[in-house]
């Protein structure tokens, strides 16, 4: 079984809804990135980039699981982008009952690195395993 690299319309609409809400809250504009880009959006104001944004939607409530994971691949992309631009990358998560965010940097500073489990609960192929960082949701700021 192969894993689809393309988001579906529901993913696209969910990301856009959250991006619009954050743009209003943070008084900025959001620039959606193309498929296969390193991040989902760039927040900017007066044509000046402010932050990269990566979105995730969970089908659980905020308190159902005490942690979130992010792949080493995503952290490498963040590290390279931050080294060049100095911009933060906010990891934005929508749970069934909350929306929150944290800087990807927190996954490096406070996270625990592990090998991912084999599971059907991710979009990856069942047997894909990689290094991940596991971060307590205590590091997320709820909106």
Explain the meaning of each model-derived region.
Residues 2-9, 24, 56-101:
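Catalytic cores of nucleic-acid endonucleases
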Residues 39-41, 90-91:
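Residue-level detector of beta-strand structural context in well-folded domains
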Residues 36-38, 48-52, 73, 84-86:
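Short connector loops at helix/strand junctions that flank enzyme active sites
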Residues 1-35:
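Acidic-basic catalytic patches of nuclease active cores, encompassing PD-(D/E)XK
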Residues 41-61:
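Conserved catalytic cores of phosphodiester-cleaving nucleases, focusing on short active-site segments
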Residues 6, 24-26, 44, 79, ...:
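Non-catalytic C-terminal interaction segments of nucleic acid-processing enzymes
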Residues 35-39, 97-99:
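Short acidic/glycine-enriched loop/turn segments that link adjacent beta-strands
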Residues 32-33, 42-44, 83:
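Short, conserved, surface-exposed binding loops centered on an aromatic residue
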């Amino acid at each position: 079984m192969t894993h689809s690299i393309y988001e579906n319309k529901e993913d696209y609409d969910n990301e856009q809804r959250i991006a619009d809400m954050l743009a209003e809250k943070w008084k900025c504009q959001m620039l959606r990135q193309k498929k296969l880009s390193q991040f989902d959006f760039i927040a900017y104001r007066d044509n000046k980039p402010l932050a990269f944004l990566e979105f995730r939607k969970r089908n659980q409530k905020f308190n159902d699981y005490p942690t979130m994971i992010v792949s080493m691949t995503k952290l490498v992309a963040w590290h390279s982008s931050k080294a060049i631009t100095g911009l933060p990358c906010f990891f934005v998560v929508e749970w069934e009952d909350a929306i929150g965010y944290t800087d990807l940097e927190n996954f490096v500073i406070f996270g625990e690195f592990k090998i991912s489990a084999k599971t059907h609960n991710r979009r990856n192929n069942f047997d894909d395993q990689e290094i991940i960082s596991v971060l307590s949701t205590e590091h997320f700021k709820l909106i």
